[in-house]
Amino acid sequence: MAKILSFSDDARHQLEHGVNALADAVKVTLGPRGRNVVLDKKFGAPTITNDGVTIAKEIELTNPYENLGAQLVKEVATKTNDVAGDGTTTATVLAQALVREGLRNVAAGANPTGLKRGIDAAATKVSEELLGKAVDVSDKAAIAHVATVSAQDSTIGELIAEAMERVGRDGVITVEEGSTLATELDVTEGLQFDKGFISPNFVTDAEGQESVLEDAYILITTQKISAIEELLPLLEKVLQESKPLLIIAEDVEGQALSTLVVNALRKTMKVCAVKAPGFGDRRKAMLQDMAILTGAELVAPELGYKLDQVGLEVLGTARRVVVDKENTTIVDGGGQASDAEDRVAQIRKEIEASDSEWDREKLAERLAKLSGGIAVIRAGAATEVEMKERKHRIEDAIAATKAAVEEGTVPGGGAALAQVLPALDGDLGLTGDEQVGVSIVRKALIEPLRWIAQNAGHDGYVVVQKVAGKDWGHGLDAATGEYVDLAKAGILDPVKVTRNAVANAASIAGLLLTTESLVVEKPQEPEPAAAGHGHGHGHQHGPGF
């Protein structure tokens, strides 16, 4: 395939156009008075959302050079969402400001590498300063505050705080679409482990990039499966039952994997394969935990089981299984409660008897998974469109709340970034282009506050000036238009979210500023229509207009 190229200033400006296109679509959602964005879907109703990363993922530009810029900023939003679960719009706004100011300086003759070093140094300093000013989140009321701010709904905030209290801070909280108008919390027996699907072809929910198996059979084995002949007898029995199947094995590869993938793609059978978590003896113990929770028999040669000779009796069951690229969640396993209680008691004894700190930590993790259960929040709404939007908000709020519990909170509403500017006084002792890099970060840090104010109908620059002059933690409540003590008003952001937004924006901006050439595939030109021969008006060659 032929490639086309673009160089230096021309390349960077086309990247900037792409950055602006995506950022302008996303930043209107910032703050409590942010607007919604409607996303067209090929199938079903359109999606209405104010979630930055959801909007960013939908954007593809026709100009291939500009599209590269849009994809780079999409990476900022996605990365921030993956690490902190929120703050995607803030990260996008910061990236846009850093790119704009950076390119202006590059055009004026600044060295991009020097600017990048200055931007990185300033971002690191801001991150350290924010961490130092963070306040721990420990009680239920504080957790509810953080969740309420993220979800912009006090009912959701209370539900998340309740869920965290019941399953523990490290517990699993999942979100499902509800069947009533009310949003409800349900704590069920369940388990989650950090291994995702072996192949993305097992995905059943393209939007969420998840494999969702309802009322599923579960095969748990210590073996590596590579020959389909080993699995075939069992697969045929499961197929007769018309139920989905989750396979947890040391690995599934070769002919076995390709056969499962083909069946999943053809929709002959709903199936998903995941690798077993852990290593060695610990892996075997974790598989035994799963077997007890799901009512399965652990299929292992040393226990007298051969994979090609077992039937449905060795399979466990679960009401629901959700597998994404990183995690597998099993909800409502079909095991006996008494067996699970015995297993929990056994692990507690092992913890007491263990001398190794590491062993105790890993045993405690297994205990939490076995005894904590899974909190399921069912998003209720009057219409499917509203339900999907609410589900998005709840998922964001859960991630933000977990981030707050992990590292603490700072004042929200964009105030923390605007009031952390004194940390950059003296330009960190840097000179030349590195000093300019620090001043670029200084200008960018006010942008989230400016857009929160602007979206709420205020003059952004006037608000920035007022907030920057106030004591730490005092700022604009954009919902009411008043200047308040943000912590007392419950307007807080997880410091992990804010730090990651700054770090990821600085990273992508630095890469973009130091870009000197772009290489993209040459767009295919439309083929000309077949030559037509008209009569009465002479001959017409080529496409007619």
UniProtKB/Swiss-Prot annotation:
Record-level GO cellular component terms: cytoplasm
Stored SUPFAM superfamilies? GroEL apical domain-like, GroEL equatorial domain-like, GroEL-intermediate domain like
Reactions that this protein is recorded to catalyse: ATP + H2O + a folded polypeptide = ADP + phosphate + an unfolded polypeptide
The ranges of region (Disordered) come to 526-545
Residues involved in ATP binding: T29, L30, G31, P32, D86, G87, T88, T89, T90, G413, D477, A478, A479, D493
Q: Which GO terms describe its molecular function?
A: ATP binding; ATP-dependent protein folding chaperone; isomerase activity; unfolded protein binding
Listed under GO biological process in this entry are: protein refolding
Basic residues composition bias: which ranges?
534-545
Q: Where is it localised?
A: Cytoplasm
Which InterPro entries is this protein grouped with? Chaperonin_Cpn60_CS, Cpn60/GroEL, Cpn60/GroEL/TCP-1, GroEL-like_apical_dom_sf, GROEL-like_equatorial_sf, TCP-1-like_intermed_sf
Keyword line: ATP-binding, Chaperone, Cytoplasm, Isomerase, Nucleotide-binding
Q: What is its EC number?
A: 5.6.1.7
Q: What does this protein do?
A: Together with its co-chaperonin GroES, plays an essential role in assisting protein folding. The GroEL-GroES system forms a nano-cage that allows encapsulation of the non-native substrate proteins and provides a physical environment optimized to promote and accelerate protein folding.
Q: Which family does it belong to?
A: Belongs to the chaperonin (HSP60) family.
NCBIfam families annotated for this entry?
Answer: GroEL, PRK00013.1, PRK12849.1, PRK12850.1, PRK12851.1
Q: How does it assemble?
A: Forms a cylinder of 14 subunits composed of two heptameric rings stacked back-to-back. Interacts with the co-chaperonin GroES.
User: Know the name of this protein?
Assistant: Chaperonin GroEL 2
Q: Which organism is it from?
A: Salinispora arenicola (strain CNS-205)
Q: Which gene encodes it?
A: groEL2
